[in-house]
Amino acid sequence: MMKKKPKCQIARTKPSVENVIPYNQFKKTQPRFNGNFSALNNEEYIILFGGGRDLILGSLTPCSSSHLSNQANPQDTSEYGTDLFILNSCIIIWFNGLGYGLEIPYSSVLYHASRRLPDGREGLQLEILLTLERDEVLDMLYQSLAPQACEFDGEEAHAFTVRSVELTIRPKYSIYDRHYNNEIETLFTFENFGVNRGDDLVNNCNEALAVCMDLHGEDVQDQDQEQYQDPSMAFEGAQDLNATYSGLGDTLHGPSVYQNDGLADDLDGDLVMDNVVSRGGPEASMSMEFYANQNLAGRKNSRDDE
């Protein structure tokens, strides 16, 4: 039975020192932890990997929401500023002054990166870019302003289109700004996350997102595999496993092109490739990069040994 994909939810409990533990503190209190991040993907511990306070939430996707600061009539960012919590279980964007937040599962994260600000100043030149797959909660919080599809557009053109929203999270203060919190900070302390302002905050959050995305990578693969095994979700042309090579002309004058209707795993069984191009040799390959400071399993063969 196919598992139901997690979706965004409204968070009613704000992360605090009472219900989460920073990652550095977790390592000190758990001496048996040997750095295996996969062991943290459970509900026994709620670990804080990154985040920050006094953030400004915006959007690159045309949408209407009272939670964003870059609308025609922006809200007071001091009243509706946001806090970001990157946990091992989910991402929480907490809306200060509203009393609730947005809980985002990692399966809904399509892309994350740092984006350079065109009008940035020293120590505040980056912001976080977070692309999320839309669901009912995101549609409620961020109503799309994009034009509706024309009635003449075929349903096939939108069958595999992922509806998304691009959020930007910008620090309010630079690394060099002198700012004092109204309350004593207990989570995002210097001992746990360093200065954690401005560009340092953005870099810390991107590293934390990368680690937590890896923790949940197997969950996404399992969902994709179950979706592929479901006959109702299969492609109509997936049973045709014979890809047709478009000819040597494309190889000489540009990148080779396959007229492929399958699932990109059907490079075998082509007569032109067998007889003309590969001449009985390998028909497909993969480029791999090995770093000098990492141990390799197996051995590497030179071209003369093949």
UniProtKB/Swiss-Prot annotation:
One of the GO biological process terms: spliceosomal snRNP assembly
Cellular component annotations (GO), alphabetically ordered: cytosol; pICln-Sm protein complex; spliceosomal complex
Main location: cytoplasm
Localization annotation: Cytoplasm; Nucleus
Pfam families (alphabetical): Voldacs (PF03517)
Keyword tags: Cytoplasm, Nucleus
Induction of expression: By cold.
The keyword Nucleus appears for this protein: yes
Family in the record: Belongs to the LOT5 family.
Protein name: Protein LOT5
Gene: LOT5
